[in-house]
Amino acid sequence: MSAARRTGPPAVLLVAFVLGALVLGTGGGRARGSTVARQPQAPAVAGASTTTAAPEAGPEITLALAGDTYFQGVLADRLAADPSTVLEGVRPVLEAADLAVVNLETAVGEGGRPEPKEFAFRAPPTALTALRSAGIDVASMANNHALDHGREALAETLAAERATGFPLVGIGVDEDEAYAPFTTDVRGRRVAVVAATQVLDGSLAAAWTATDGQGGVASARRVERLAAAVREADAGSDTVVVFLHWGVEEQSCPSGDQRELARVMVEAGADVVVGSHAHRVLGGGRLGDAYVHYGLGNFAFHPRDAEAARTGVLELRIGDDGVVGSRWRPGRIEGRLPRLLEGEDAAAELAHWEGLRACTGLRP
């Protein structure tokens, strides 16, 4: 297995990337994984007591995770007007996290032709600028829209990643790159993000799946290949996040396939397993020592109905013992833009979300 890893500096420094000095990713100018710097131990002192103090706990870090994001309709208009303000309404919450991740549900580029499917999405490279400006640090592109405009757009997507320095995960020039994690040091903790999709349109699945000789997206249907990627990420990181495109559209309970895949991911070493695709918010909670959220819902996306307009940001606190705290920040989508709720509205939505856990088999 290739040792290639998409690598970034601490999330708070992502805006300081300079193309040519440091470009995220693997291959074609992408950076290789780096060794985590450890604090040296003090040397033993002759005649001193052999009693050693318990090691100090490392600093906690925070993750912010959100769902399906694209740039159609009013979002395209806002992107054309000013990429830096497209998602300004949720920027404070995303920027406050040490690492923020979303699912980017679109091809990125100007070329290519729409694939033979009902919906084919595309956004210009400034979409990546908009994500960064919103406080987002990395985006999963392991989904059923990443190649909506074919291989020309795939090449443009990867070129946009290199040109902007904004990291994408779950997509690549071959399977090693598609399954490679994004890794970054966050205040002394090494965090890896792996992404894959269970969902690919039947007639396009083979053409879109990354292989040794073909670019595309990481497939979660290749369960052992994905589990191997998670194990490799776990071996070189303190915290592993797996971001999946999975589930059944318009269903608010996880499928059996989702629950089984979550179990496999946790056994492989994932500390956090999240995902989207159903265009519904699903429940979240504990699975063993890990935290699983089966459906983050839409984020910046057109909601077909009131249920699809439910959204939110999952905030997780990570410490020496893994996930030590969680918070669902509920919201509503208005005009394809997410708006986080406050007061009684937030309390009502939070109670609704808590109730969604009942069909997940997860613990609070």
What residues fall within each predicted segment?
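Acidic, metal/ion-coordinating pockets
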Residues: A3-P364
